Structure formats: structure tokens, C-alpha cells
Amino acid sequence: MEVADRMMSNGVDNDRRSSPSPHRGNGDMNNGNGNGNRDSRERSPPRGNSRERSPPRGGSPNRGGSPNRGGSPNRGGSPNRGGSPSRDDKRRYGNGGNGETRNRLANTASPSNVLGVFGLAPQTEERDLKDEFSRFGKIDHVDLIMDRKTGRSKCFGFVYFENKEDAVRAKEECQDLQLHGKSIRTDFSATKKPHEPTPGKYFGNPRYDSRRSPPRFSPYGGGDRYGRGDYGGRGGGGDRYGRDDRGGDRYGRDDRGGDRYGGRDDRGGDRYGGRDERGGDRGGDRYGRDDRDRHREDSRDRYNDRGGDRYNDRFRDERPRDSYRR
């Protein structure tokens, strides 16, 4: 019995060893290689299906039917662009630049005693304005603005009343007044600055053009370009062709007492010789003959007296005699 039981237990063990595991069997049935990892990979959904499930690019709302591109209100129907005035509107109504600014300044100008008169005829003069506006009150003066280049009227001017109330009354009653066939317009001056009859004139310091050389002035004072000074020809630097500051003619006599190129000198006689008032003879003239030169000349004279000039004597002895002498 014991032997039979051992044999039966051995048979069961052998059966267990020989029987394949269920996992490997399934793997062999599915893959044929016994690889369980590939089985799990095959069970995952394929990549191709995931790509097909993603929406195509052609139907993207941001690409094809994007409202920002095709129907963007900022492009086609932008209220900022569509509502801006077009060129036709500018031609029809104007750009509203200087005219609007001028009218706004004129309308906001505070009442004053200066009344501007605009739209005048070219032949209207200052006396005509004074005669026309003097019926409203006393007038200080009238300025008719003239063109500086042509000298003609610019067709507007300013009437200066002594009282501001008279200017206010004249403005109210003289609107659309006919003067020399022109309908004039009156308004208060928009500026407090005085109005000049010829605008454009420069009242400041003189400015020199870089293309022109500045005026030449003497570094020592007055004087024009050709030497005449502020005091009758003796300005700073003196006359260019006459007397200088030291008081003498440049080519004539000197104030120091003598001619520059000859004559006597206050410092002691003739410059080129003669006696010196400071102490007798200066020792000779200025061109080389002083006391030392005189000593050399005396020595040479004594040498000639003793023996003569040997070279001159030999030359006299060797001279050929006259062949024609008999």
C-alpha cells in the first residue's frame, strides 16, 4: 500500500511538471512565441485610430472658418476705419484745420479795446477805418497791416479804442458792414501783443548769415573797414593808409622826432651817423665803421708806409712795357 501510494504521488508530480501553465498556453496560442508583453500591446488601441479620431486641420475653426480672419470686424467692418472721414468728406467739408482753430480763437477771445477788422478792400486805408469807427467812440490809433515786400494792404487791420465799451458796441453794430464794396467782419483781437503794420520785421539783435562774413571791427576800438575811425580818421588802429596810433605817418615823419628812414632823431642826432646828443660821437656810422675798424685802418696805413704793398709793387714791375714806345 505504501508503495502504491508513492507511485501515485510520483505520477501526480510528473503530470504537474509536464502539464503547461495556462498563461504560457494562452500566450502561445495568441502569439506563437510565448511573449505576454506583446499580447498587452496588441490589446491597446492602435495609433492609426487615434489619429483618425482627431479632427482634421482643414475643418479647424481657427484656420478655415476663423472669424478673426475672414469675418473679422477689425478688418472689413472696423468701426475705427469705416467711421473715419473719407477723402470725399474732406473735400466736401474741409479738414477743419486752420479755419476751425482761427474761428475757435476768435469766438473765445475776451472783449478788449482792440477790435480786428477783416475782409477789407485793397484800396481801404487807415483814415477810412478811423472815419468809419470813430462814430462809436474815441479812437487811439488804427493799424492797417501791410505786406512788407510789396507794400500793399493785407486787407485787415486793428482799431484801438480808448474805452472797451466802445469797442464792444462797434463789434455788435458793424458785422457785415459794407466798406468799399466789401462786407467786413469785426472781432476782438485774440492776442494781447501789439500789432505791427508790417509783420515780419525783425527787431532783435542782428544775426549774420553763415554764408556772409561778419563785419570787421578793429580789435583796438572803433574804425571802419577802410581805416577811418570814430573820431575823424584816428580810430583804434589808426588810418590804414595814413597816420597810426603812435602819431606819425607810416611812410613819413615819426612823432618821436624824426624821419624813420633818415633825418634827425630825438634820441641823439642822425640815425646813420653824426653826433649824438647823449654824449658826443657814437664812434662812427651805423654801417660798420666803429673805433675798432678805425684802428685796423691805421695799422694798415702804417704797414704800407714802411714797405708798401709787396703784391702791388710786384704787379707794377711785371707789367709789359709799351712795344710801340721808341
UniProtKB/Swiss-Prot annotation:
Compartment(s) where it occurs, according to its Swiss-Prot or TrEMBL record: Nucleus
UniProt cross-references to Pfam families, sorted A to Z: RRM_1
Record's GO cellular component terms: cytoplasm; nucleus; phagocytic vesicle
Cystine pairs: none
This protein's UniProt keywords: mRNA processing, mRNA splicing, Nucleus, RNA-binding
Compositionally biased spans, kind Low complexity: 56-85
Residues in RRM domain copies: 113-191
Composition bias type Gly residues, residue spans: 220-239
Biased composition (Basic and acidic residues): 38-55, 240-326
Domain of life (superkingdom): Eukaryota
GO terms under biological process: mRNA splicing, via spliceosome
Keyword hit for Nucleotidyltransferase: no
MF term (GO), any: mRNA binding
Biased composition (Polar residues): 104-113
SUPFAM superfamilies to which the protein is assigned, alphabetical: RNA-binding domain, RBD
Chain positions covered by the region annotation Disordered: 1-114, 179-326
Protein function: Sequence-specific RNA-binding protein which participates in the control of pre-mRNA splicing.
Family (UniProt): Belongs to the splicing factor SR family.
Full protein name: Transformer-2 protein homolog
Organism: Dictyostelium discoideum
Lineage: Eukaryota, Amoebozoa, Evosea, Eumycetozoa, Dictyostelia
Gene name, Swiss-Prot/TrEMBL: tra2
